């Protein structure tokens, strides 16, 4: 059962995919790959944009947040702007708890 629902578009889906791939690469360098990260990456890849809402649990929210923070740190280290990542992190941190939105 999903705890939260994220209204997701193509840009967010691509950002989630890149962030989770980087997170998996960092985990493999440290020698411990968490199955939850792999499962979340597969869930994001299988997500259809026609559904409009990605259902996530608390653990999946934590995985996304950690992956996006790592991507943000990577961008800041390269001297790039992280405004888009910051806005997505806020959306992940404060997701909707209802499947039905009022807009």
Residue ranges and their predicted role:
Residues 1-103:
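Positively charged, low-complexity terminal tracts
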């Amino acid at each position: 059962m999903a705890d939260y629902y994220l209204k997701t578009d193509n840009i967010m889906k691509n950002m989630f995919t890149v962030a989770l791939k980087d997170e998996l690469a960092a985990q493999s360098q440290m020698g411990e790959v968490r199955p939850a990260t792999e499962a979340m990456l597969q869930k994001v890849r299988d997500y259809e944009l026609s559904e409009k809402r990605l259902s996530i649990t608390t653990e999946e929210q934590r995985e996304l947040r950690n992956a996006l923070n790592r991507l943000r740190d990577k961008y800041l280290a390269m001297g790039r702007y992280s405004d888009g990542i910051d806005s997505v992190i806020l959306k992940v941190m404060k997701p909707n708890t209802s499947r039905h939105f009022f807009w």
